[in-house]
From Swiss-Prot:
Keywords (A to Z) from UniProt: DNA-directed RNA polymerase, Nucleotidyltransferase, Transcription, Transferase
GO terms, biological process: DNA-templated transcription
The organism of origin for this protein: Chloroflexus aggregans (strain MD-66 / DSM 9485)
Record's protein name: DNA-directed RNA polymerase subunit beta
Cysteine disulfide links: none
Database matches in InterPro entries: DNA-dir_RNA_pol_bsu_external_1, DNA-dir_RNA_pol_su2, DNA-dir_RNAP_su2_dom, DNA-dir_RNAP_su2_hyb_sf, RNA_pol_bsu_bac, RNA_pol_bsu_CS, RNA_pol_bsu_protrusion, RNA_pol_Rpb2_2
Length: 1227
């Protein structure tokens, strides 16, 4: 035995952190930051996308829809016209708290003013119509729908517009190009080139036709620049669309003699002019219908030129212009149509064919469909608008039908409008859409991530079966827009992503990311004068002071002022020479003072070249805008005046990483963390972790269950406060003021204007995932708060910071094989001191309904139940709050009338003699499920008689909330933030854990073999830094890609009086002997994940059986058995365990008679009889017989064996012994 270790005074884990709290200002955790780069801008509100989008829908989206559908006319268009005018939202009937309690939808009444015009008399009838209760978004970006919080996830889809793609011809190897014209709503046009140089088109996915047929037909449509148009008169149709006309139109592009595309297509085209082409097109699109000129024109107009049937949307027109009209550098060419033109123009289609010919001839490049310039985000407002449009179109159909049936003179708006289609459309969307999701509320981070998610799935998107590798892969255009790390593992990988920290969605739906503008030259006064009005603020490049505000009209004086302000303090990159006299004004390298700036501003030169300087100006760029610029990363070294220290820097240009001279740089990243999502930016030392493990770390943080006493991490990244604040789970002060009262369930703040605001706290509320939401005040009476301060913590926050786990002392060492294969050994201290204890709240509900035999009743008077089982029920038959319950205890007593069919002959006789008194009832009480125990914390009763809104046929609903306190135990899943996950294998007594030289036992033992192959070294650096910071009594922030370096960690370890390598000799707690080698020890932040052993463990002896095969059901939810499959049978065969195998396949499974007799034999202690015929064998024979095969079963002596066809003959054997927990009538 080694000598006893001398006693050492234990230093506290973390010294109390006091940020100079004087009772007046808000207390916040202070962190020592290792960041060297300051973010150029603050993080935006992290749920801004959701809030802004819904606001847009309320303000503009609905207005667009009503304008689109107005006026609704009758089928003749001569009698009635219905116009939708202004609309208003009323006040919601209940607030969000009540809606959650009562299982209602948080919604506001939508009313719209409607005007009915009777065209025959000129009379106008006005009325205000109620269009249903419209679900409203809460301040946290969620919807409360039927009592549950839901989130509408943004959808990432292919943007409307035209896309060019190349496909190799397998025989010749030539690149043949195709084009797809995708509208927001309406018919698709798909163009393709074949190897014989014929260009064909598919209209609305119908048959292929030569493109010249379409070109000839639309050449007769005379379009105006606003999108409206008309057909050429009948007698002139012959003059349009001749061969010479078509060849002339494409002469400038169709220039390769070996491949004359238009001529090859004309040769395949049976028509010769617009008239013939219209008829031919109609024949191809509507085969079987008689082709007339009128029908053909109506069809083409409705397919391509009618705004009610074809809509490119503003974004579609923007992409079309960009791809067709702005690709071409010719200045003298036709101008692009206006963005308000949302239908096709004939020249768009001609231009697509032109572009295809150019691509086929080797000019230009096809589009990259996975580029974010070609994919846009449909946010919540647009998704709701789309669904509301469906409802309005259904309503329009109803209105038109009613208009044709009613007398115009007596028609009223109320009589014409039926709101049911609109209400049903919204119910479909919020209740059943793939994009309206039950919010992940496990912890605040899960909630926030759910609101920032981008899904490529859903209506109009991809399906996970058909999505290939390319669409799932990380693309260079994702930089700063979509996180390259955070995505699910499994079939949805790459199809579901998360917005990066600084990303936002622009008005077109494209993702943008911010960059700091780099100035290489300054515009002289005459250039500023030409700009007329300033479109942005102009600020001093050194100080950031305002020189001229946005919207200022630029005259001579202001233009001079701007140029001088920007030039002052800058260094010239080239000599400045007066163009008129040739006089040298200043040499390169001169710093510009005011006098020099005033001389330069008078020179007749447009730009002054300066040494590049990174300004405070921030531009948000979309992916296709970014491709034109050279962008340097945020870590490029700058001096105190924001000039580059190096002459060349590493930059991004398009998809390439290049080294460029600083003069060529256009922009700089605003922050090192702008690449990743919020969840990923919470991983310290992310840059030292392999991407696969970082992905797991990001995903597992969202699964961390809230613990009893939240503890913010010692080693954070500085993102903890903002994440918690914007998640919606903490309470944030709306305005500045002073706290006048702070109790457990409410905080009252007196604002500066004397008005008092009350903040209600959520106490022990159940989340969607059965975790506990409990808000606690983090302010005291008399404390000053500012708008945006966190005034109450939630279950996973600590002083306003995200706190998903606990700081624990870990050692990386093997221990008796207990941490083999990533298993985790934990100390009993974590159990005893409730360090990893979590609260879980489960909801149980029972309804008393009207049945055919009479109403169900909630009562204490339950047949065949002893007094002991009723001890916790009140006089109503409902369990009281505070009762501790075990599996199978009654929560709510309920009886259901029994049907006549259930009565025996004796019972029917008694019924006939005594009447209703003898009426039998069945016990249908709500009981605690198997494996569940806990304490009742809330009971709610909703009765129709008391005015509660209940579903049809329900008289009363009782809801019971059961609370469980779960300590950490063997089988629970734990993880760090670096993807280092494992299952607790054993809880060791504190005295058996290895201990430090000062006598302190470690809390957790992790396996060192789990580190090298996983390449997540971040966990080791976190452990070292955590130990040093804990000893020195402060918390640290080590931001991603800008965190602490190895030498800084070593210095801190030495400063804390710890070994520089972070390793220490440990002693075995059982023997007191030293371990052979020093061990890495330190404080790591560990999470307990939502995969708890208590939810997973399950055992069955007898239980329910499948109806057809009579085999036990599967899964814990069905109280199922363990499947003994084909491979397991092979294993027993290999051992020759014949009797065990026979039992498995018969009495333990589907030998119906045998299993009852076996059960009986075991109970009575008799020998077990031989097994019978399994039910699945009978099923197999029946299946073979159903194929028309005559199948007989013969015994060993070749005599036929009779197999009973149904269970009736076996039921005699089942009398008295119920293996399944079913009533006899339920077989």
């Amino acid at each position: 035995m080694p000598p006893l270790i001398e006693s050492v005074v234990l230093q506290p884990l973390i010294a109390p952190i006091d940020p100079g709290f004087d009772g007046r200002r808000s207390r916040r955790i202070e962190r020592r930051s290792f960041a060297r780069i300051k973010d150029a801008i603050d993080l935006p509100l992290l749920i801004e996308t959701q809030l802004k989008s819904f606001e847009w829908f309320k303000r503009e989206g609905l207005r667009e829809l009503f304008d689109e559908i107005s006026p609704i006319t009758d089928f003749t268009g001569k009698n009635l016209e219905l116009h939708f005018r202004e609309y208003t939202f009323g006040e919601p009937r209940y607030d969000e708290f009540e809606c959650r309690d009562r299982d209602l939808t948080y919604a506001a009444p939508l009313r719209v003013k409607v005007e009915l015009r009777i065209l025959t008399t000129g009379e106008i009838k006005e009325s205000e119509i109620f269009l249903g209760d419209f679900p409203m978004m809460t301040d946290n970006g969620t919807f409360v729908y039927n009592g549950a919080e839901r989130v509408v996830v943004s959808q990432l889809i292919r943007s409307p517009g035209v896309y060019f793609k190349d496909e190799k011809d397998p025989t010749s190897g030539r690149a043949l190009h195709t084009a797809k014209l995708i509208p927001n709503r309406g018919a698709w046009l798909e163009f393709e080139t074949n190897k014989r140089d014929v260009i064909s088109v598919k209209v609305d996915r119908k048959r292929k036709i030569p493109v010249t047929i379409l070109l000839r037909a639309i050449s007769a449509w005379i379009a105006n620049e606003d999108g409206s148009g008309r057909w050429a008169p009948d007698n002139e149709l012959d003059k349009y669309g001749h061969n010479e006309h078509l060849i002339e139109l494409f002469r400038h592009v169709d220039t390769v003699a070996e491949h004359l595309y238009i001529q090859a297509t004309i040769d395949k085209d049976p028509s010769h002019n617009a008239k013939e082409a219209l008829l031919e097109l109609y024949k191809r699109l509507r085969p079987g219908d008689p082709p007339t000129l009128e029908n053909a024109r109506t069809l083409i107009e409705s397919l391509l030129f009618n705004p009610r049937r074809y809509d490119l949307a503003k974004v579609g027109r923007y992409k079309l212009n960009k791809n067709l009209w702005e690709r071409d550098a010719r200045r003298d060419g036709p101008k692009a149509p206006d963005l308000s033109v949302r239908v096709l123009l004939p020249r768009d289609i001609f231009r697509i064919v032109e572009q295809m010919i150019l691509l086929n001839n080797g000019y230009g490049r096809p589009d990259d469909i996975d580029h974010l310039g070609n994919r846009r985000v449909r946010t919540v407002g647009e998704l709701i608008q789309q669904q509301f449009r469906v409802g309005l179109l259904r309503l329009e159909r109803v209105v038109k039908e009613r208009m044709s049936l009613q007398d115009p003179a007596s028609a009223t708006p109320n009589g014409l409008i039926n709101i049911r289609p609109v209400v049903a459309a919204m119910r479909e969307f919020f209740g059943g859409s793939q994009l309206s999701q039950f919010m992940d509320q496990t912890n605040p981070l899960a909630e926030l991530t759910n609101k920032r998610r981008l899904s490529a799935l859903g209506p109009g998107g991809l399906s996970r079966d058909r999505a290939g590798f390319e669409v799932r892969d990380v693309h260079h255009s994702h930089y700063g827009r979509i996180c390259p790390v955070e995505t699910p593992e499994g079939p949805n990988i790459g199809l579901i992503g998360t917005m990066s920290t600084f990303a936002r969605v622009n008005e077109m739906g494209f993702l943008e990311t911010p960059y700091r503008k780099v100035y290489n030259s300054i515009d002289n006064a005459q250039v500023w004068r030409e700009k007329g009005i300033l479109l942005r603020d102009v600020r001093d490049l050194r100080t950031g002071d305002l020189i001229a505000a946005k919207g200022t009209r630029v005259d001579d004086q202001i233009a001079r002022q701007i140029t001088i302000g920007l030039l002052r303090g800058q260094i010239l990159r080239e000599d400045v020479v007066d163009p008129n006299t040739g006089e040298l004004i200043a040499e390169a390298g001169t710093e510009i003072n005011r006098a020099l700036a005033e001389r330069i501003v008078n020179l007749p030169m447009k730009q002054i070249k300066i040494r590049p300087v990174v300004s405070q100006e921030v531009d948000y760029l979309s992916a296709d805008e970014e491709d034109r610029f050279v962008i340097v990363q945020a870590n490029a070294p700058l001096d105190e005046h924001n000039r580059f220290l190096d002459t060349t820097v590493s930059c991004r240009f398009g998809e390439d990483f290049v080294t460029e001279r600083v003069e060529r740089v256009d922009y700089m990243d605003v922050s090192p963390k702008q690449v990743v999502s919020v969840s990923t930016s919470l991983i310290p030392f992310l840059e030292h972790d392999d991407a696969n493990r970082a992905l797991m770390g990001s995903n597992m943080q969202r699964q961390a269950v809230p613990l009893l006493r939240p503890d913010a991490p010692i080693v954070g990244t500085g993102m903890e406060y903002r994440t918690a604040r914007d998640s919606g789970q903490v309470v944030v002060a709306r305005r500045d003021g002073v706290v006048v009262s702070a109790t457990g369930n409410r905080i009252i703040v007196e604002e500066d204007d004397g008005k008092r605001t009350e903040y209600r706290l959520r106490k022990f509320m159940r989340s969607n995932q059965d975790t506990c939401i409990n808000q606690r005040p983090s302010v005291v009476r008399g404390q000053q708060v500012r708008a945006g301060d966190v005034i109450a913590d939630s279950s996973s926050t600590d002083q306003g910071e995200l706190a998903l786990g606990q700081n624990v002392l870990v050692a990386y060492m093997p221990w008796e094989g207990g941490n083999f294969e990533d298993a985790i050994l934990v100390s009993e201290r974590l159990v005893r001191e409730d360090i990893f204890t979590s609260i879980h709240i489960e909801k149980y509900e029972v309804e008393a309904r009207d049945t055919k035999l009479g109403p169900e009743e909630i009562t204490r008077d339950i047949p065949n139940v002893g007094q002991d089982s009723l001890r916790n029920l009140d006089e109503r038959g409902i369990i009281y709050i505070g009762a501790e319950v075990q599996p199978n205890d009654i929560l709510v007593g309920k009886i259901t009338p029994k049907g006549e069919t259930d009565l025996t002959a004796e019972e029917r006789l008694l019924r006939a003699i005594f009447g209703e008194k003898a009426r039998e009832v069945k016990d249908s009480s709500l009981r605690v499920p198997n494996g569940v125990r806990g304490k009742v914390i809330d009971v709610k009763v909703f009765s129709r008689s008391e005015g509660a809104e209940l579903p049809v046929g329900v008289n009363q609903t009782v809801r019971v909330l059961l609370c469980q306190k779960r300590k950490i135990s063997a089988g629970d899943k734990m993880a760090g933030r670096h993807g280092n996950k494992g299952v607790v294998s054993r809880v060791l007594p504190m005295e058996d854990m290895p201990f430090l030289p000062d006598g302190r036992p470690v809390d957790i033992i992790l396996n060192p073999i789990g580190v090298p192959s996983r390449m997540n070294i971040g966990q080791i650096l976190e452990t070292h830094l955590g130990w040093a910071a804990a000893r020195l009594g402060f918390r640290v922030a080590t931001p991603v890609f800008d965190g602490a370096h190895e030498d800084q960690i070593k210095d801190l370890l030495v400063q804390a009086g710890l070994p520089a390598d972070g390793k220490v000799t440990l002693y075995d707690g059982r023997t007191g002997e030293k371990f052979d080698h020093p061990v890495t020890v330190g404080y790591a932040y560990m999470l307990k994940l939502a995969h708890l052993v208590e939810d997973k463990i399950h055992a069955r002896s007898t239980g329910p059986y499948s109806l057809v095969t009579q085999q036990p059901l599967g899964g814990k939810a069905q109280f199922g058995g363990q499947r003994f499959g084909e491979m397991e049978v092979w294993a027993l065969e290999a051992y020759g365990a014949a009797y065990t195998l026979q039992e498995m396949l018969t009495v333990k499974s589907d030998d119906v008679v045998g299993r009852v007799k076996t059960y009986e034999a075991i109970v009575k202690g008799e020998p077990i009889q031989e097994a019978g015929v399994p039910e699945s064998f009978k099923v197999l024979i029946k299946e073979l017989q159903s194929l028309g095969l005559s199948v007989e079963v013969l015994s060993a002596d070749e005599k036929p064996v009779e197999l009973s066809d149904d269970l009736d003959s076996d039921i005699g054997a089942l009398e008295g012994i119920n293996l399944s927990g079913m009533e006899r009538g339920e077989f």
